[in-house]
Regions:
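Donor nucleotide-activated moiety binding/catalytic core segment of transferases
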Residues: 132-148, 211-222, 367-383
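NAD(P)-dependent aldehyde/semialdehyde dehydrogenase
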Residues: 281, 289-409, 420-427, 434-467, ...
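Well-ordered, non-membrane alpha-helical segments in soluble/globular domains
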Residues: 38-42, 189, 240, 273-284, ...
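N-terminal Rossmann-like NAD(P)+-binding subdomain of aldehyde/semialdehyde dehydrogenases
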Residues: 1-140
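Conserved NAD(P)+-binding/catalytic subdomain of aldehyde/semialdehyde dehydrogenases
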Residues: 197-300, 305-307, 448-486
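Short, surface-exposed connector motifs at secondary-structure boundaries
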Residues: 170-175, 201-202, 222-229, 404-409
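Short hydrophobic alpha-helical runs that function as membrane-insertion/retention elements
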Residues: 173-177, 232, 254-255, 412
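Conserved small-residue-rich beta-alpha loop and adjacent elements
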Residues: 113-197
């Protein structure tokens, strides 16, 4: 069976299926040829964007709030279609995907949208904010959305929804590359918008298309300053390196890089059975929530210990607690692996044979905990998955910092005092977020900085309109003739 993935271009659904692609797990899907329909995907004229500024920012918010009422699995045929795709193509169970869709309605609440607007400033998104400069010039500044290609991640439905909302709030034009392991959500968003408000300018400002990554024939035509001014890339190293070759004057690159996240278990973690149990429950959620598919999931935890035999035995017992708590996570947020890589499982099994260096708990589709007895994290720490955690005992924070780089997005800490003690140190080592253990997955990237970026601000083009005449701003040509001659 070949699954059909349409192009949705500026409010129109294109179902001329003729190009077949192989999915990650064996199934085929078929799409329209994006080269054939590039003229439909691109704006015919930049003046089409002007319709977005004939509606108010309040109208934009109302549109998104109304959209939230239609984003319902029980009544939305496009979400039901996407759920069938999720069973075949997604990395996680369809139950987790449905739970994520349900939670996305929070992003469409008026309070959330207003908080997002505040990160840029309503006065900049709604109109031209006036600034009176010291030299007499009056500057009026407006933040504009622009035509942007979004190469989103497929590790869940979140990136598609985030792109939809962000694009609407800045009133840009989004061309979304559909990820091969999350084929449904972006299309469902676009088609739901068409059902709700087919002629609305925001509906026509969100297009979705699948093309094979690295298709230089298509990308060289799409990634041109006359077509897009931004590329927002959520891809990995190879993907971003590939996209970067299209960056030139007139095209900016905004990256939300795949990151890794860590935990720090201060000495107080092991002070009592109560603190150990609490930390284990929290850490289990940080590891297993979303099946460890997110950048915010913990993959390595550094445990401060004196290195004694007794302390190592305590950490082994703690590791078992974490493993047991992972098994108790609710099925709507976590499950056993459904597509487990045999190569990964072999790596974990090999470590279990090295008793002097590693203590391994689990290591199968249920997940696992690997305790490094020699103080070094496993050599595939950045690629830990399927709810697999590496606990690394270290004597102090300095011993841990050699592992902390710009690649680390979130650090969860326990107890709370660790955050205040280390936040500056972690920041200068490149960490972008420090939070309480158990809250690593509760990341409000819609409002707070995302991967070190203020996303909405960075996605805008900031335009200044200057009034130099009202206050007679200085200029060489305004000086008296005699003074010029001198």
């Amino acid at each position: 069976m070949k699954y059909q993935i349409p192009i949705v271009a500026r409010g129109a659904v294109i179902e001329d299926y003729e190009v077949t692609h192989k999915g990650r797990y064996g199934a085929d899907f078929i799409c329209p040829d994006p080269n054939k329909y590039l003229s439909k995907i691109l704006l015919l004229s930049r003046r089409e964007l002007e319709s977005l500024y004939q509606i108010s920012l309040d109208d934009v918010v109302d549109y998104l709030v109304e959209f939230g009422k239609h984003w319902n699995m029980d009544t939305n045929p496009h979400l039901q279609w996407a759920s069938e795709l999720a069973k075949v193509f997604n990395d996680v169970s369809v139950g987790l995907v449905k739970h994520a869709w349900s939670g996305q309605k929070n992003a469409l609440r008026r309070e959330t949208l207003e908080a997002m607007i505040d990160t840029v400033g309503r006065e900049h998104l709604e109109g031209w904010k006036r600034y009176d400069r010291a030299n007499g010039r009056i500057s009026h500044i407006h933040a504009f959305g622009v035509p942007t290609a979004h190469v989103i991640a497929g590790n869940g439905p979140g990136p598609a929804m985030m792109t939809f909302v962000r694009n609407a709030l800045i009133r840009g034009y989004a061309i979304v590359k559909i990820p091969s392991n999350e084929l449904g959500t972006a299309v469902a968003l676009a088609r739901t918008a068409i059902d709700m408000a087919p002629d609305h300018p925001l509906t026509k400002a969100f297009s979705t298309v699948y093309w094979r990554g690295g298709d230089s024939g298509f990308e060289s035509k799409l990634y041109h300053p006359r077509n897009v001014e931004r590329i927002v890339a959520w891809g990995g190293f190879a993907s971003v390196t590939h996209i970067a070759k299209y960056v030139r004057p007139g095209i900016d690159l905004v990256t939300f890089d795949p990151k890794i996240s860590r935990s720090i278990l201060g000495a107080g973690t092991f002070a009592s059975e109560t603190t150990m149990r609490e930390a284990a429950i929290r850490l289990a959620d940080d590891v297993g929530n979303g099946n460890q598919n997110g950048c915010t999931n913990c993959r390595v935890a550094y445990a401060i210990t004196d290195g004694s035999s007794a302390s190592i035995e305590k950490i082994k017992r703690f590791g078992q607690m974490v493993f047991d708590e992972i098994q108790k996570l609710p099925p709507e947020i976590s499950s056993e692996a459904i597509h487990m890589d045999p190569g990964f499982q072999s790596k974990v099994a090999a470590l279990s044979m090295l008793d002097d260096d590693f203590h391994v708990i689990g290591g199968d589709k249920r997940g696992g905990v690997i305790i490094s007895l020699g103080g070094d994290q496993v050599d595939f720490a950045d690629d830990l998955k399927y709810r697999t955690l590496n606990i690394v005992p270290v004597k102090d924070y300095d011993a841990m910092l050699r592992f902390i780089t710009r690649d680390v997005q979130t650090v969860g800490v326990y107890p709370e005092s660790v955050r205040d003690e280390l936040r500056t140190t972690l920041a200068v080592h490149g960490v972008q977020r420090i939070t309480s253990l158990g809250y690593m997955r509760e990341y409000n990237a819609a409002i707070d900085p995302h991967d070190g970026n203020e996303a909405l601000r960075k996605m805008c083009t900031w335009v200044v309109a200057e009034d130099c005449m009202t206050n007679y701003a200085p200029a060489l040509w305004r000086k008296p003739t005699a003074e010029k001659a001198a």
